[in-house]
Amino acid sequence: MKYIVMQDAFFVVLLLVLAVPLGIYMYKVMIGEKVFLSRVLEPVERFGYRLMGVSEVGMSAKRYAVSVLAFSAVGFVFVMAVLMLQGFLPLNPEGMKGLSFSLAFNTAASFVSNTNWQAYSGEAALSYFSQSIGLTVQNFVSAATGIAVLFAVIRGFIWKKQKTIGNFWQDLFRVTLYILLPLSLILALLLVSQGVVQSFADYSVVETLENGAKQLIPLGPAASQIAIKQLGTNGGGFFGANSAFPFENPSSFTNLIEMLAILLIPVALVVMFGRAVKDSKQGRAIMTAMMIVFVIGVVAITISEQFAGPHYQGVATSGSMEGKEVRFGVGGSSLFAASTTAASNGAVNAMHDSLTPLGGLVPMFFMQLGEVIFGGVGSGLYGMIGFIILTVFIAGLLVGRTPEYLGKKIEPYDMKMVCLLILVPPLLTLFGTAVAVMMPSVQASVSASGAHGFSEVLYAFTSMGNNNGSAFAGFAADTTFTNMVGAVMMLLARFIPLVAALYLAQNMAGKSSVAASSGTLSTKNGMFIGLLIGVVVLVGALSFLPALALGPIADFFTTFK
C-alpha cells in the first residue's frame, strides 16, 4: 500500500510539472503569439488557410456553432462511409467486411462526438484503412473541436463589448497543428520505442508451444492511434482489450506515460485559463477543486480494490486482481480507472466490470458528475465553468446580490445556457437507462443478474450520455437498439452543451466588465473551492443517487451475504 501511495503522489507531481509549461504554451497558441514551433509551422499554417479558403474574420456564436456542426456532420458521413465500404478499400490485408448500418452509425457518432464507445473489437472488425484514416483522423479533429470551443468560451470572459468569439477554422487548425500533432508525434515515438505495435504488415501466424497449435497475432498502426486516443481524451482502443492489451500498453512505464497523456491537456487547459483571464489564482482554484475530487476518487477505488471486501478477507493478500493485468497491479489499474473516467477518456487497462462494487461506483460517479473533474479536452473545462457560474448564482441568491464572475454579471440568459450545459447529460443518461432496462434486447445483453446487471446497463448509458466511452464489459453492446439509441445520445450529449457554451460565450463577450467591490464573491479562495465541490457533487448525487442505490450500492451490500 505504501508503494501505491508513493506511485500516485509521483504521478500527480509529474503531471503538474508537465502541465504548467504546456498550459503557458497553449495560451500563446490561443492568442496567436509566436511560439518556438512558429518558424517551422507558420508556413504550413498560412498554406492551410489558403488551401481551405479560410478568412480570419471573427464569428458570432451562431456562425461558430454552424461551422462546428457542419464540420462534424461531414466527418460523421465520411467515417460511416469508410466503415461500411471498408471491404472495397485498400489497407485491408485480413479482408474485413463492411460494418452493419447500425454499428457503423454508432461508431461514427461515437468518434465524431469524442466518445469512442466501441461495440466492436478493432482487430476482428476493422481494416487498417478504417482505423488510421477513418478513426484516427476523427480522434484529432474531435479533440481539436473541443479545445477550439473552449478558446471561444474563454474569449467571452476576457473580451468586452464584442459581437464575435473568434474563428472556428483558425482555432481548429492552430490547435491541431501546434498542439495535438507535435504531442502525438512525441508520444507515438515513445510508445514505439517501448514495444507498442506500429506496422502495416499482415497479421502474423505463429506456432504455439502447446501441441503446435496455430495462433493469429494481430498487428497494425496502433501507436499512432494510441497517442492521440490518450492525448485527445478519445479512448477508443486499436485492439478490443484496449490498454490492457500488451501491444497497446506493454509495461508499467507505458502505463505511466499513457495515464499522464490522458490528463495532461485537460490539466494544462486549466493553467491556460488562469493565464488567459490574467489571474492565475482563478486557475489554481479550479485546479484545486478538480484535484481534490480526483484524489478522493483514486483513494476510494484503491482501498476498495486493495482490501477487496468481506468475500476476500483472509484469502487475497494482493487485493482483488480479477480483471487486472499483473504488470499493473491494483495501484496502476485503480489510478488508470480514475484517470480515464475523470477525463472523459474511456480507455481501460483493466476490466471495469470486474472491479469491486465500490471500486466500480467511483468511475461511474466521475462520469455522472458531468465529466468536469478535468473532463474531455476543452469540454471538461467549459463544463466546469458552467458549474462555477451556477455556484456563483446560488451564492448570489443567498446574499441578495447580482452574481458576477470575472467581472461579468450573470443574467437569466446566461443561466439558461448553463442549465443546458449541466442538465442535458444526466437527463440523457437517466432517460436512456430507463428505456433500455425495459427492452428485451438490452436485458439479453446483460451477463449478470440482480444489482450488478443493472450496474452494467447504467454504466453503459452513463458512458454514452457523458461522452466517455468505457464500459462494463459484461454488457453486449452490439444490438440495433443500443447502437441507434446510443448514437443519438452521444451526439446530443456532445453538441447541445457545446452550442450552449458558445451562446454563453457570445453573451459574455458583449458585456462590459464591472469593478469588483467589497461585496463581490471571491472565486479564488478556499470557501469558493468548497462551494464549487459541493455544487458539483450535489448535482450528481441528486441526479443519480436513486439509480446508484439500485446498482453498485445494492451490489456492495450483497457481498455481506
UniProtKB/Swiss-Prot annotation:
PANTHER family linked to this entry: POTASSIUM-TRANSPORTING ATPASE A CHAIN, POTASSIUM-TRANSPORTING ATPASE POTASSIUM-BINDING SUBUNIT
UniProt-recorded name of the protein: Potassium-transporting ATPase potassium-binding subunit
Topology with respect to the bilayer: Multi-pass membrane protein
Similarity-based family: Belongs to the KdpA family.
Chief localization: membrane
Keywords: Cell membrane, Ion transport, Membrane, Potassium, Potassium transport, Transmembrane, Transmembrane helix, Transport
UniProt keyword Membrane present: yes
Pfam families in the cross-refs: KdpA
Oligomer status and interactors: The system is composed of three essential subunits: KdpA, KdpB and KdpC.
Cellular component annotations (GO), alphabetically ordered: plasma membrane
Domain of life: Bacteria
Protein encoded by which gene: kdpA
